Amino acid sequence: MKRQKRDRLERAHSKGYQAGILGHPKDYCPYKTTVESRSQWLGGWREAMEDRAVTA
């Protein structure tokens, strides 16, 4: 049985979080055209920046 792909918005959030943890700027966002995906990516990025501030 094939595994189902994860939801695209969930994946965008996850990728944004990973980019934030690595310290990439928010201009690093690959989602320039789709507003929903960009919003999710930025949400993950912001969450990561908060987590970095707490642990730093």
From Swiss-Prot:
Q: Where in the cell is it found?
A: Cytoplasm
Keywords on record: Cytoplasm, Translation regulation
What is the predominant subcellular site recorded for this chain? cytoplasm
**Taxonomically, which superkingdom?**
Bacteria
Segments passing through the bilayer: none
Cellular component GO terms, alphabetical: cytoplasm
An annotated GO BP: regulation of translation
Family (UniProt): Belongs to the ribosome modulation factor family.
Its biological purpose: During stationary phase, converts 70S ribosomes to an inactive dimeric form (100S ribosomes).
Q: What is this protein called?
A: Ribosome modulation factor
Q: Which organism is it from?
A: Serratia proteamaculans (strain 568)
> What gene is this protein a product of?
rmf
